[in-house]
Amino acid sequence: MVLTDEQRQAIAKKREEAIRRAAAYREREMQAAANATASTSSAAPPAPPKPVIPVMFSQNRQNFQPMKPTMNNSTKQSTINNYIKQVQKPEPTSLIKPTIGVKLKLDIGDRIKIEFYPFHSAVIDLIKQVPSRNYDPAKRSWTVASSDHITISNILKNATAVKVELEPLPQNIIGLTNFKPKAAPSDLNTVMDPSLIERLFPYQKEGVIFALERDGRILLADEMGLGKSVQALTIARYYKADWPLLIVCPASVKGAWKKQLNTFFPIIHRIFIVDKSSDPLPDVCTSNTVAIMSYEQMVLKHDILKKEKYRTIIFDESHMLKDGKARRTKVATDLSKVALHVILLSGTPALSRPSELFTQIRLIDHKLFTNFHEFAIRYCDGKQGRFCFEAKGCTNSEELAAIMFKRLMIRRLKADVLKDLPEKRREVVYVSGPTIDARMDDLQKARADYEKVNSMERKHESLLEFYSLTGIVKAAAVCEHILENYFYPDAPPRKVLIFAHHQIVLDTIQVEVNKRKLGSIRIDGKTPSHRRTALCDSFQTDDNIRVAVLSITAAGVGITLTAASVVVFAEIHFNPGYLVQAEDRAHRVGQKDSVFVQYLIAKKTADDVMWNMVQQKLDVLGQVSLSSDTFRTADKMHLRFNDAAQPGIAEYLKKTPDTTIDEWEDPVEEKEDDDLEIICDSPAPKRIKN
């Protein structure tokens, strides 16, 4: 059918009308939405929209009209109700609760630290509801007693003024807040040999009691030189019913531990030192039996040790067990699970590297942290790295320290126990290392050359060559000892005087000090006299200068370096007067600290000969009072050394004729500690009184 022009015009008009009505419909919809939005600010809800009447087209395009909707009363009411539900009055902005993140942490002193962010006074008001709350203005932090853990948690959870997102303490830490030490005797003299106990300093007695309160499972982390080894032996002796005792230590200090036992426990006559795989272990379990071995031998004898079930074990230098994947750590862990008493010794606990503490903690209490992954996330900034899980950081360090001090660790710095220490302590340290071993043939040849020479002049020349070679060979081991024991990461700030004789030894020490980027001064024979005063002043006043590298002969007199409290002799000298004068650069008027003196000795070197020569030049032993880190007074000290050919350090440091009694007031001597070995074979003289 062909449309006429009139029909086409009519269709076009109707189409335009339909478009117009559709546009009008859309405009009404938009207006209704605008009215609904505007009405949200008024108290009354907006009027419901009128029902939409759809436009229906009939098949005949020439005639179209809207269809009337069919809607009864119930349908209308339902539509209105649905619309009212959709258009709700929003809560005013002023009534929205701020969200505050709150984190609970264990703090030192049986306290729980409360950290929150952002700051809101409402949280302060909540904390103040707890009677035990305390504010530390220095740390700007709030704490409550650990016994109020549940109380503060409930108060924060039920807060109304703010929305609290609470991060509570982990369950294992909550359990630790309830930890109660075991009852221990307040007077050790009632349960142990009084002659042993009276030799301990007060802080050492506290360390023993701390261990007994924890059933002999602790980490003894006192600073080097404070007598960890004698504390460990005293603790172990309390549990003699659970002997034989097993001591695992670095190979170089096995002899030192034996001497400690001979000194303090002469009744113990069955001491087994395991040097090689064929060496036997104790075949009977008695309270007078001790086995001493290196970590390497512990690994080799793992099966035998596990079968014997040692119930009291000392792990010396326990930071050697920091690697959980190392075989020695796995063996030590197996042994510690069977043992009743486990005593760890370390003067350098890695509190800023908590990942290294995990294995040591588990040796003492394997239930405290059962999972390294969880431990690392909370304390090591543990996270998934590009290739593996990484735990190299440090988080919540204060909480970890609080846990360790409460449950398993005791650590005292020299500054903490200064009142208990004598004015000056001396000790001999035997150093060893691959550089010494590698040159042992040369050293033995030099010694043989010295011994076979008859001419006094030639003998002196030969000794000087032997002395020089010894200094060169010792230098690397000396540097390693000084840096590892005094300038390790997190070491307490201290100043150290390092004395040597040969230029090559001084140079080696200077290079290693510079590598560590330690501020230092150097005074030797090449230092102009007018420069010495300025160098000494800078050492005394500049906190960034921590090391003085000094010549025994050139810097041993005429200068004051009392800012240092540690004196290390990398080499010794023929004349004991030079040694005493060098010590007194730090031990003199103006010194407010206890001076700690170390002599670094290498066995089978010229040092052996030098000690004998020093002894021959001394006249009397009298005016030197001795005091070890295990004895409170010199009068009670009687150290013996099995090798009669090896003279004691007490004999080397006798008073020289031109030394006044006042200058020698209270000089003291200290026996071996940890990897240190004292060699004394004479009873202590009486202390000189003014």
Curated annotation (Swiss-Prot):
Domain Helicase C-terminal positions: 482-639
Nuclear localization signal (motif): residue ranges: 411-428
Enzyme class: hydrolase
Chain span(s) of sequence motif DESH box: 316-319
Catalytic activity entry: ATP + H2O = ADP + phosphate + H(+)
Domain HARP: start-end pairs: 92-170
Major localisation: nucleus
Keywords annotated in UniProt: Chromatin regulator, Hydrolase, Nucleus
PROSITE patterns: HARP (PS51467), HELICASE_ATP_BIND_1 (PS51192), HELICASE_CTER (PS51194)
Region of interest called Disordered, as start-end residue ranges on this chain: 30-49
Pfam family, one: HARP
Record family assignment: Belongs to the SNF2/RAD54 helicase family. SMARCAL1 subfamily.
Stated role: ATP-dependent annealing helicase that catalyzes the rewinding of the stably unwound DNA.
Name of protein: SWI/SNF-related matrix-associated actin-dependent regulator of chromatin subfamily A-like protein 1 homolog
Taxonomic source organism: Caenorhabditis elegans
